[in-house]
């Protein structure tokens, strides 16, 4: 139960994903190809995977994944490869993450073209006005691509567009809720299953017949002041049951006989 609860609370959304597979001796090329296929819907652009060894000889893998669209998952087991479960993080500084992966690799595999992160949304002020400033749309695109949570998204907007943040906060909050929706927890009924199961139709019928549709001897005694014992009540109820059954059979017999006579009359036609 604890594992399912933690899995429901997990959420990852980013175009840059940093994965670490501990105790994993798998080939980096095989792992890269499998991850590439897993994220096909988000249009992968680049992946690098490096194998490293601890001092005790234990192998582990590091991988950096870059996609055109943000990878959006709520299943913490999504990136599991051959039973190996990774630590999943958002790579806020892809340049540093890539350098870290390449520090002491035993084996490396790359696919695609690495996309370095821009040093600043507003450009480099030391270069004066010679470098064109990014447009508002470009800055927002960077914020949407690199923010990893609702709080970080709003904080980045506040930093880059303080006036817009102060005057149009409700619109930014709306977009934040769309980008990072709340994870709905699975409903767990506070009431344990009943025994017998009340959803079982057969059990309900078995209970209805003697308790609702039939008169109990005790109820009959309450309704009949002249009935003093339980045996008398049972005897009266049995007699009434037999009598009503007999009367129903007689009615059915008369109805069937009348139906046959009507059919014969229709066949013979009216008398002359």
Curated annotation (Swiss-Prot):
EC number: 3.1.21.-
Polar residues compositional bias, start-end: 119-128, 245-264
Keywords: Activator, Covalent protein-DNA linkage, DNA replication, DNA-binding, Endonuclease, G1/S host cell cycle checkpoint dysregulation by virus, Host cytoplasm, Host nucleus, Host-virus interaction, Hydrolase, Metal-binding, Modulation of host cell cycle by virus, Nuclease, Nucleotide-binding, Nucleotidyltransferase, Repressor, Transferase
Domain of life the protein comes from: Viruses
Region described as Transactivation: spans on this chain: 221-230
Span(s) of short sequence motif RCR-3: 100-103
Cofactor: Mg(2+); Mn(2+)
Protein's cellular compartments: Host nucleus; Host cytoplasm
Pfam families found in the cross-reference section: Gemini_AL1, Gemini_AL1_M
Residues at the catalytic site: 100
Keyword Hydrolase among record annotations: yes
One GO cellular component term: host cell cytoplasm
Assembly, per entry: Homooligomer. Interacts (via LXCXE domain) with host retinoblastoma-related protein 1 (RBR1), and may thereby deregulate the host cell cycle. Part of the C- and V-complexes which are RepA-Rep-DNA complexes involved in the c-sense and v-sense transcription.
UniProt record similarity statement: Belongs to the geminiviridae Rep protein family.
Protein name: Replication-associated protein A
